[in-house]
Amino acid sequence: GKRHRRKPNRMSDAEIIVILIHFHSGGFRCFKHYYLHYICKHCKHLFPKTVSYNRFVELEKEVLLQMTAFIKQVLLGECTGISFVDSTPLRVCRNQRILIHRTFEGLASRGKCSMGWFFGFKLHLIINDKGEILNFVFTTGGVDDREPLKEGVLLKNIKGKLFGDKGYIGKTLFESLFIDGIQLFTKVKNNMKNSLMSIADKICLRKRALIETVNDELKNIAQIEHSRHRSFCNFIANALSAIATYCFFEKKPAIDLEFINDGQLSLFEKLYRTHVILDIFYFSFNNS
């Protein structure tokens, strides 16, 4: 058969990942300008074996698995019992260019968010009250916000109370999450009856805008969203490196909360114990 050269890359996977992550933290907006005029000129002592820009773009897709494992295993935060969930659109082109768009043809789809219709993908996030990302997943733009929660993709190591917007309203979803030890709180629609909740839960629900701040930092401080991608792999590499950059931020948006035991969960324990005692009494009474 035809022989292929298996020459190792000049740049290591770690060097490629570091360059991708540093791009989002340096305030740059054009990766080509950043790589050619900053990395290749001013950081030659840190990366002595730099390759051409075209070759570096080709190498990005080879570190996707390593970068994903690095984020999932090292950079994600820990659940504190109070979590916030939301999705944000990642547009790949303007709405006027949807019909002539070719880069993500067959991959991206139309979706609708609070800002209107868009064409692209969705980033689903779960964060804690410290602003740390607990988990994330990418879907096409037309996927319902509740689907990742129904499938359990986002809920690994999540427990306690979960706060979301009106897009997560659903009786079946609430019941399935409650069985798994997660209590879902959402704002009610105008035609719905108001639900009873404690003052602490109402305050946390008002603080749900915390995750909107995280989305804003991912898009404006980092550059997770732009329309200059030329392949799906490089789109994912850019998005993952933006998430990794955010995880390295020393100061994240956070809220100060004090845990208050409102006795909601103990109420279910008391009802269960009462039910068990009544069953025992009924069984002993019939046997006598």
Could you describe each region identified by the protein language model?
Residues G1-S288:
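Short alpha-helical elements
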